[in-house]
């Protein structure tokens, strides 16, 4: 074997070992959190997630108070809702997974409508980038647990609503225990592993799952595992590749779009609880915010050979969903690993060694993002232009110099790797690398004054 081949194989093995160690560290952290949770507040958790079977002493309301009548009068006078509908809401419990752009308006409307008990799950903390769409949080609660921040706001809105916070990640190890105590589950998450986890758990526990999503100017909504409707796996039996997944942190979203879908998730939950109207099971509502149009399309029915919800399921217990999907169960930076170490450059090395030397620095972010902030030396060529080679005429003379290093960067160091692969194939004799971690790494490691978004 050639020496260069040996070096390449060593680099590949070292990279794989590093990735496996990182995965092991995440699993060990999950185990530590679970053990700490069980040992420190097992009895409290039983009260939090206890349903009528686990907590037989929980009161069942059979009449409305004068305050209830005054507070909910505008919906009480609806002929198809009335007193019985309000009592069903008062005796109901809803679990909201994710207190972000979808979960905040959903929780707000459910609390306002008189849902008796809300469970709030979110591992994250409030930060300024949340405020344009996550309307329960405020400037004064920056750094607070999102679940706790939402609880404070909801109790100000309706002090009669019983609210329980789960400020933790939802894992295979704790999902069934938590979900068991609620009547309806709302998927307000922003990642694929959690969607599979919630769907599988709700099938196993026979809970309806109201699932919403929003990205850019568009939103979608459906109800899984209700009546004869399908589960999430019936529609998506195989997860998408990680590089094909875009969340609102990468693609952006308008706050009013998440508000629209979140409010409609609350509406579907109320319909399920009360038995009101035609629940969105077996149908997908699609909202186009740019045109203001709503479409309602029929989706496939239950898959007879579904691995989870069929008569003879192959999956009867929750699995490792991060491994199944090949991505993290969070909406935080989810770094791709498409390049070898010799094809990448740290921001510190770039700043120390290369920045003052002749080179071509290409920022592959969309133009709208480039206008927010940019490095002084960077030229903007969006990734779509890299992939269709429309940039070649623009840099014809520079690209003739095979000694000129080409550095590609983006916001987080993911799109730049895709760009490197394409440019290296086009110019195999050039030195083409990307900046690890992108502009986020630049802010964290080189220039703290550089804006981060």
Curated annotation (Swiss-Prot):
Q: Does the keyword Zinc apply?
A: yes
Which keywords accompany this UniProt record? ATP-binding, Cytoplasm, Metal-binding, Molybdenum cofactor biosynthesis, Multifunctional enzyme, Nucleotide-binding, Nucleotidyltransferase, Phosphoprotein, Transferase, tRNA processing, Zinc
Quote the Gene3D superfamilies the UniProt record gives. NAD(P)-binding Rossmann-like Domain, Rhodanese-like domain
E.C. number(s) listed in UniProt: 2.7.7.80, 2.8.1.11
Q: Which GO terms describe its biological process?
A: Mo-molybdopterin cofactor biosynthetic process; protein urmylation; tRNA wobble position uridine thiolation
Q: Which residues bind ATP?
A: 101, 122, 129-133, 146, 190-191
Pathway field: tRNA modification; 5-methoxycarbonylmethyl-2-thiouridine-tRNA biosynthesis; Cofactor biosynthesis; molybdopterin biosynthesis
Could you say which residues bind Zn(2+) here?
A: 231, 234, 306, 309
The entry sums up its family as follows: In the N-terminal section; belongs to the HesA/MoeB/ThiF family. UBA4 subfamily.
- Tell me the protein's name: Adenylyltransferase and sulfurtransferase MOCS3
In the UniProt record, what gene is named as encoding this protein? Uba4
């Amino acid at each position: 074997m050639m020496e260069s081949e040996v070096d390449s194989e060593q680099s590949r093995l070292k990279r794989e070992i590093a990735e496996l160690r990182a995965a092991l560290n995440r699993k060990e952290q999950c185990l530590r959190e679970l053990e700490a949770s069980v040992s420190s507040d097992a009895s409290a958790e039983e009260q939090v997630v206890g349903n009528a079977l686990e907590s037989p002493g929980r009161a069942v309301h059979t009449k409305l108070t004068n305050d209830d009548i005054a507070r909910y009068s505008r919906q009480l006078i609806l002929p198809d809702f009335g007193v019985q509908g309000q009592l069903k809401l008062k005796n109901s419990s809803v679990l909201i997974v994710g207190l972000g752009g979808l979960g905040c308006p959903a929780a707000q409307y459910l609390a306002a409508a008189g849902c008796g008990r809300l469970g709030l799950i979110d591992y994250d903390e409030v930060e300024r980038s949340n405020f344009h769409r996550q309307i329960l949080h405020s400037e004064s609660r920056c750094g607070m647990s999102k679940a706790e921040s939402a609880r404070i706001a909801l109790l100000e809105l309706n002090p009669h609503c019983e609210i329980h916070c789960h400020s933790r990640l939802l894992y295979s190890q704790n999902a069934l225990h938590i979900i068991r105590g609620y009547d309806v589950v709302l998927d307000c998450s922003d990642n694929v592993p959690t969607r599979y986890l919630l769907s599988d758990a709700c099938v196993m526990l026979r809970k309806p799952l109201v699932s919403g999503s929003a990205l850019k100017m568009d939103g979608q909504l459906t109800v899984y595992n209700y009546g004869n409707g399908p589960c999430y796996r019936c529609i998506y039996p195989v997860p998408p590749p990680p590089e094909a997944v875009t969340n609102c942190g990468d693609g952006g979203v308008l706050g009013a779009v998440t508000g629209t879908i979140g409010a409609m998730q609350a509406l579907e939950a109320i319909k399920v609880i009360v038995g009101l109207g035609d629940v969105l099971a077996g149908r997908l509502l699609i909202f186009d915010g740019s045109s203001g149009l709503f479409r309602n399309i029929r989706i496939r029915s239950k898959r007879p050979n579904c691995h989870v919800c069929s008569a003879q399921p192959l999956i009867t217990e929750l699995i490792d969903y991060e491994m199944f999907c090949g991505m993290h169960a969070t909406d935080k930076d989810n770094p791709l690993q498409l390049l070898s170490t010799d094809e990448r450059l740290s921001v510190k090395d770039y700043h120390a060694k290369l920045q003052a030397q002749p080179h071509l620095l290409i920022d592959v972010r969309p133009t709208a993002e480039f206008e927010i902030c940019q490095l002084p030396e960077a030229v903007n060529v969006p990734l779509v232009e890299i992939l269709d080679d429309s940039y070649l005429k623009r840099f014809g003379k520079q690209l003739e110099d095979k000694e000129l290093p080409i550095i590609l960067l983006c916001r987080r160091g993911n799109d730049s790797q895709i760009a490197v692969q394409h440019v290296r194939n086009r110019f195999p004799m050039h030195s083409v690398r990307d900046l690890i971690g992108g502009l986020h790494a630049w802010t964290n490691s080189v220039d703290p004054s550089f804006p981060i978004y």
